[in-house]
């Protein structure tokens, strides 16, 4: 049997055995079960099939009960979602009808995953809960805190952000003022195109570990499923920006039609659930979550990839212009 290590950049170590099984070795150990192990078990138990099959895990028992590895079926794929989307954007400044159909399908698959995660259960870690006014206020307060930290961090390099402070707070405060609707559930927590795979003309979603910088307790927190949606929408923007940086020019609006197709697929597949905010509040919630994501991106790019700072800054300026 063959053994090889996956060499792409990641926060864990992945080893493929005989091109049939992949084991992820968890580098950052925390107390309790890793969220990927928990999420994989729940999704498998309740019939979600659009993910690599969970085969098992390794748990360190004793005083420190921790997941040290998770094992999945190794899936031979056409590409991951990031490579696929960048390829589509390179091929044409306007997404093709077939590409938009596949993006619409991706939205539907995410909605199906969220519907499974909203399955009634006696497990308190996964039982869906109604969103309360206190949740909306807490989320908005956290976003406003992140906004202050981000602008303080970026004000010297990106002085135009100072004028965005009040308009962005106004948008975030709309979230806090909503009448609560929809459910909060366990969700992916770190969703982007790189966490999806194209296989046999369909989509798989994987890597349910959540953001590695967060503790297990933080990663288990329930939230509106639109948090995952916001992450995917930002990934579309990054794929387009990557192609523009390669070409040295800003192309036509690739992202707009892609967003619309994804949201159309997601909302259509969610109609039979009570997961989402009421229709008139959907955009308010989603925009606040996108702002939260963009603020994180700006802090990350300033620390790790200064040449990419323009991507989140451009989004914030477009928000101010009402686009």
Would you name each region that the model predicts?
Residues 180-186, 199, 220, 285:
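Alpha-helical hydrophobic/aromatic positions enriched in membrane-embedded helices and signal peptides
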Residues 1, 146-186:
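An alpha-helical support segment within catalytic cores of ATP-dependent transferases
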Residues 187-194:
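Canonical protein kinase catalytic loop motif
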Residues 249-253, 257-274, 284-323:
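ATP/Mg2+ or Mg2+-diphosphate-binding catalytic cores
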């Amino acid at each position: 049997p063959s053994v090889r290590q996956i060499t792409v950049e990641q926060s864990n170590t992945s080893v493929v055995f005989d091109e049939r099984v992949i084991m992820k070795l968890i580098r950052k150990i925390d107390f309790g079960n890793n969220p990927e192990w928990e999420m994989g078990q729940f999704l498998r138990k309740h019939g979600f099939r659009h993910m690599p099959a969970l085969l098992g895990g390794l748990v360190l028992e004793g005083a420190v009960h921790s997941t040290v590895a998770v094992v999945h079926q190794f899936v031979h794929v056409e590409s991951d979602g990031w490579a696929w989307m960048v390829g589509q954007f390179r091929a044409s400044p306007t997404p093709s009808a077939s590409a938009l159909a596949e993006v619409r399908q991706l939205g539907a698959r995410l909605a199906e995953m969220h519907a499974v995660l909203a399955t009634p259960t006696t497990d308190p870690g996964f039982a869906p809960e109604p969103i309360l006014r206190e949740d909306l206020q807490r989320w908005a307060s956290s976003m406003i805190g992140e906004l202050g930290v981000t602008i303080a961090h970026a004000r010297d390099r990106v002085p135009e952000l100072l004028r965005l402070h009040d308009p962005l707070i106004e948008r975030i405060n709309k979230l806090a003022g909503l009448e609560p609707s929809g459910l909060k559930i366990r969700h992916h927590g770190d969703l982007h195109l790189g966490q999806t795979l194209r296989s046999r003309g369909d989509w798989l979603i994987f890597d349910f570990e959540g953001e590695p910088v967060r503790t297990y307790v933080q990663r288990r927190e329930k939230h509106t499923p639109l948090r995952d949606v916001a992450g995917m929408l930002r990934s579309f923007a990054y794929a387009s920006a990557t192609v523009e940086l390669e070409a040295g020019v800003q192309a036509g609006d690739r992202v707009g039609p892609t967003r619309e197709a994804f949201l159309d697929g997601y909302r259509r597949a969610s109609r039979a659930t009570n997961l989402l905010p009421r229709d008139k509040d959907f955009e308010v919630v989603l925009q606040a979550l996108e702002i939260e994501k963009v603020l994180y991106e700006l802090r990350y790019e300033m620390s790790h990839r200064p040449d990419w700072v323009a991507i989140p800054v451009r989004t914030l300026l477009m928000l101010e212009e009402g686009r």
